Design a protein with these regions (language model features):
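Non-catalytic nucleic-acid substrate-recognition regions in nucleic-acid-modifying enzymes
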Residues: 2-138
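C-terminal catalytic and target-recognition region of SAM-dependent MTase-like enzymes
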Residues: 287-404
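Short, charged/polar, Gly/Pro-enriched secondary-structure boundary elements
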Residues: 45-52, 160-163, 377
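Residue-level signal for inorganic ion chemistry
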Residues: 23, 96, 144, 304, ...
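A short, flexible beta-alpha/helix-coil linker loop
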Residues: 101-104, 161, 306-310
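Class I S-adenosyl-L-methionine
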Residues: 99, 124, 145-187
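Conserved S-adenosyl-L-methionine
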Residues: 176-294, 309, 317
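Basic Arg/Gly/Lys-rich low-complexity intrinsically disordered segments
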Residues: 2, 370-480
């Protein structure tokens, strides 16, 4: 039996339950929900699958040591006691991310320096040589988390944040994070059973993530690589098997519609959709929401309208008034989900939300609200809807956000919220300098064929071909 070990999947606040459900479906064990994280146990294959398949995880950490420390010297001694040759070659590079919630350790950079010193001194004493530190694209990325005096040192198996799927070619200003977009879609219970509409789709993040969910395409298939591919115990054959397994992918018989009134956004969305290989599933149209008409088929709206950071208040309130008007007159019999962080914007919609889910979009504390659009009174609408479902004899219904399985809470003392006035470390994905994706040019790294549609049709009967270094995932633009 393969060795089982603990792992931690980091995510955004508000997506923890969705992530736990994903891990359950993946076959993970001992799932416990914490704040912006979910812990679980599994083997090496599970770690590879978690990185490759999870839509709402930012990164997957593998803890290698838990200890308590009251000062920097204790941290140094505990780190130096680790047999580092099991995790790092002296000729390889490494980097350290520190996350600190502690009165004893107030500066995360100082903690990083102490960890670095302990590792360097370990190798210098053992071999007379030392590994080098490389901030961008290191061979091994370490994460140390300190909550008061409780310390956890982990290997970061992901490297570049998992929200960087690899299909995004360009972006509009302040694009929606891919992990958040996927989490929003999964919260609604939609899995491709009807058409999906984003009337303000920007660079196309929601439509692309929706297509990947509907077709059950793993989000990791577009990535250049993962940090674990540079580990000393990397099993290339095992990961190739996971990468090449498309047996869970499925057909999508409906359509996803993306609208926007910005020509540049429409152009960018077109490139991103093509890079993801889902152009056949998404219909893009340059159209303002004012011209939105009642869809012929049952549909769901999931959208992330502007919040007002770059729009005047009057224009913003007018926009949300228009959203409410279009929903009431051109989306009857369907449901719409809207993300925003301003209460006055929601007020302008003029509809009563049947569900409100708190979410964070970067530093903004938002709400994701569900609106059920109907004619007449709400009670009549619900009784008619329930009667139709009973008459049709439908079995399982799409899962509802409030009816999820309960998971064990994370043990106390870990990932505590900060006190008032206490400095807050950077959230995952927030204002973090981009760490370039793995270069993976070494001879022992086996690159895989990208799946973008511009690479031609794929033979589903056999594995993807390996063609050396991965090619760009979208053709270069022809010179005019």
């Amino acid at each position: 039996m393969s060795e089982q070990f603990e792992m931690i999947a980091k995510t955004f606040q508000g997506l923890e339950e969705i992530l736990a459900e994903e891990l359950t479906a993946l076959g993970a064990n001992d799932i416990q929900i914490g704040r912006r994280m979910v812990s679980f146990t599994g083997d090496k294959r599970m770690m590879y699958k978690a990185n490759f398949c999870l839509r709402t995880a930012i990164r997957i950490l593998k803890p290698i040591k838990n200890f308590t420390a009251k000062d920097a010297d204790e941290v140094y001694n505990q780190i130096q006691a680790i047999p580092w040759e099991e995790y790092l070659d002296v000729n390889k590079t490494f980097a350290i991310d520190a996350v600190v919630f502690s009165e004893e350790f107030r500066h995360s950079k100082f903690v990083s320096y102490k960890v670095k010193d302990a590792i360097v001194d370990y190798f210098r004493e053992k071999t007379g040589k030392r590994p080098s530190v490389r901030i961008n694209n290191p061979d091994v990325l370490l994460n140390i988390h300190i909550a008061q005096t409780t310390c956890t040192l982990s290997l970061d198996s992901s490297g570049e944040s998992l929200h960087r799927r690899g299909y995004r070619q360009e972006a509009v200003e302040a694009p929606l994070n891919e992990v958040l977009a996927a989490g929003m879609i999964l919260m609604t219970g939609w899995r491709g059973e009807c058409d999906l509409i984003d009337p303000m789709c920007g660079s196309g993040t929601i439509p692309v993530e929706a297509a990947l969910i509907a077709k059950n395409i793993a989000p990791g298939v577009f990535r250049k690589g993962f940090a674990f591919e540079k580990w000393v115990d990397f099993d290339a054959d095992m990961f190739d098997e996971i990468y090449n397994d498309d047996s869970q992918e499925r057909e999508f018989t409906h359509k996803i519609y993306g609208y926007d009134n910005n020509p540049k956004a429409n152009e960018i969305a077109t490139h991103n959709i093509k890079a993801a290989g889902v152009s056949k599933d998404i219909v893009l149209k340059l159209q303002p929401f004012q011209q939105f008409e009642q869809p012929k088929e049952k549909s769901i709206i999931i959208t992330n309208p502007p919040y007002g950071e770059r729009i005047s208040t009057n224009d913003l309130l007018g926009l949300y008034q228009m959203i409410g008007e279009r929903l009431k007159h051109a989306f009857v019999g369907n449901e719409a989900w809207v993300l925003s962080y301003r209460e006055e914007c929601f007020d302008q919609i003029g509809l009563k939300a049947s569900q409100k889910v708190p979410l964070f979009n970067g530093p903004l504390e938002c709400e994701f609200r569900k609106y059920e659009i109907f004619d007449g009174k709400y009670k009549e609408f619900k009784s008619q809807e329930e009667g139709e479902e009973k008459k049709e004899g439908e079995g399982e219904q799409a899962p509802r956000f409030r009816e999820r399985k309960e998971f064990k809470p994370r043990r106390e003392g870990e990932f505590k919220p900060r006190r008032d006035g206490e400095s807050r470390p950077r959230r995952e994905g927030e204002y973090k300098p981009r760490r370039e994706g793995g270069d993976f040019k070494g001879g022992d790294q086996r690159d895989r064929k990208p799946r973008g549609e511009f690479r031609g049709g794929r033979d589903s009967r056999g594995p993807r071909e390996f063609r050396g270094n991965r090619e760009p995932r979208i053709p270069k633009k022809e010179e005019e």
